[in-house]
Regions:
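Hydrophobic residues within beta-strands of alpha/beta enzymes
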Residues: 136-138
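Acidic/aromatic-lined carbohydrate-recognition and catalytic surfaces
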Residues: 1-122, 126, 130, 141-189
Length: 189
């Protein structure tokens, strides 16, 4: 998936912009994760630490104090599957390591705290704003902020700070954000 292109089956950006002249358009943006088939993740698998996207993803070795979570830390995480949220990334050099994967092996979580991710998000949100978005739905937003020793779901105040960062990007365009939460926000308490 690439937020800079429209699937040709649906036209191109000029067609979307034409619709935006007449209709209120809401676009969906996966803020928490990216396709394992994306050029960004593939570049990471090919080049590992030499990839310009090496910190776009949440690498267990960097996230957890000892490179791995304790059983208690895994139990504390609000998970979408009955195990620790990771996929084994297999690099071109023959090595492998765990990267965060909340939902599915094809959906690799983004490290929203990294500068690479901040640029990536800014670039994508700006593209959507410039092509007619009136509202942008932030898919799986409550999972985007993660902190060791927590549920890694709707972590306060981090989640509000991250939402403010996103709002600052879209505000000049008059675009509204709709963060998807999945569950009642109080469940993290």
């Amino acid at each position: 998936m690439d937020y800079h292109k429209v699937d040709p089956a649906f036209g191109d950006w000029s067609d979307v912009e034409h619709l935006a002249e007449k209709y209120y358009l809401m676009f969906d943006y996966m803020i928490n994760h990216i396709s394992a088939q994306s050029p960004y993740y593939k570049d990471f698998l090919e080049k590992k630490d030499a990839s310009e996207y090496h910190d776009l993803f949440i690498r267990y070795k960097d996230f957890w104090e000892n490179g791995e979570p304790t059983e208690e830390q895994v139990d504390a995480i609000y998970k979408r599957k009955p195990r620790a949220p990771y996929v084994e990334a297999r690099f071109a050099d023959g090595t492998s390591e765990k990267v965060w994967c909340t939902f599915d092996e094809e959906q690799i979580d983004i490290n929203c705290k990294s500068e690479t991710a901040k640029r990536f998000i800014r670039d994508n949100l700006t593209t959507l704003c410039e092509h007619g978005a009136a509202m942008i739905r932030l898919d799986a937003f409550a999972y985007a902020t993660k902190k060791a020793g927590t549920s890694c779901f709707f972590i306060e105040p981090d989640v509000w700070e991250f939402l403010k960062e996103c709002e600052d990007i879209v505000k000049p365009y008059g675009v509204t954000l709709l963060p998807e939460i999945h569950e009642h926000y109080t469940m993290q308490e």
